[in-house]
A protein has these predicted regions:
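Catalytic cores of DNA base-excision repair glycosylases
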Residues: 1-148, 152-155
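Long, low-complexity, intrinsically disordered segments
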Residues: 154-162
Length: 162
C-alpha cells in the first residue's frame, strides 16, 4: 500500500505495485540484490516481458538492445529499417539493419523520432531528416497542401426522424 500513492497515476497501478514489490523480493533472494544482466532472468521476474528486459539491458547495462514500443514499431515499419508484423520481427530487423556503433543509442532515437516527428496521426514528414529514405513521406503533405489521399467522409448520423 505504501507504493500505490507514488504510481497511482499510471494504468494498472495495483498490479504494477504488486509486481514491483515481488520483483524487489526476488532480486534480493535470487540475485543478491543485483538487477540481473540476463534477458531470461529479467523476463522471469513478474511483469517483465521482452520489451522491459530490453529497456533494462540497454539503459542500465549499455547493451545493444532495441525495445520495441509503439513508436519504434511505427518508425521501423514506415522507414523500412525494421519491417515486421510483430514487435519481435521489428526488433530483429532493426538489429540486423542498424550498424553496431549505433545500436545502444538507436532505441532512444527511434522513440523520440516516433514521438515528435513520425507521429501516428499527423506525421511531420515535411520536417523529417529521414524523408529521403522513407516510403511513407508521399502519404503526408506539408501543412497547407492538399492531402495526398482524400480524407474519409463521415456519414451523417441517423437521427431516427423520418
Amino acid at each position: 500500500d505504501g507504493l500505490i500513492p507514488y504510481i497511482q497515476t499510471i494504468g494498472l497501478y495495483r498490479s504494477k505495485a504488486k509486481n514491483v514489490l515481488e520483483t524487489c523480493r526476488l532480486i534480493l533472494e535470487h540475485h543478491g540484490g543485483e538487477v540481473p544482466r540476463d534477458r531470461d532472468a529479467l523476463q522471469a521476474l513478474p511483469g517483465v516481458g521482452r520489451k522491459t528486459a530490453n529497456v533494462v539491458l540497454n539503459t542500465a547495462f549499455g547493451e545493444p538492445t532495441i525495445a520495441v514500443d509503439t513508436h519504434v514499431f511505427r518508425v521501423g515499419n514506415r522507414t523500412g529499417l525494421g519491417k515486421g508484423k510483430t514487435p519481435l520481427a521489428v526488433e530483429l530487423a532493426l538489429l540486423k539493419n542498424i550498424p553496431d556503433e549505433f545500436k545502444v543509442d538507436a532505441h532512444h532515437w527511434l522513440i523520440l523520432h516516433g514521438r515528435y516527428t513520425c507521429q501516428a496521426r499527423k506525421p511531420r514528414c515535411y520536417d523529417c531528416v529521414l524523408a529521403d529514405l522513407c516510403d511513407f513521406r508521399h502519404k503526408t503533405p506539408p501543412p497547407g497542401e492538399a492531402s495526398a489521399t482524400p480524407a474519409l467522409r463521415r456519414k451523417p448520423k441517423a437521427t431516427g426522424a423520418v
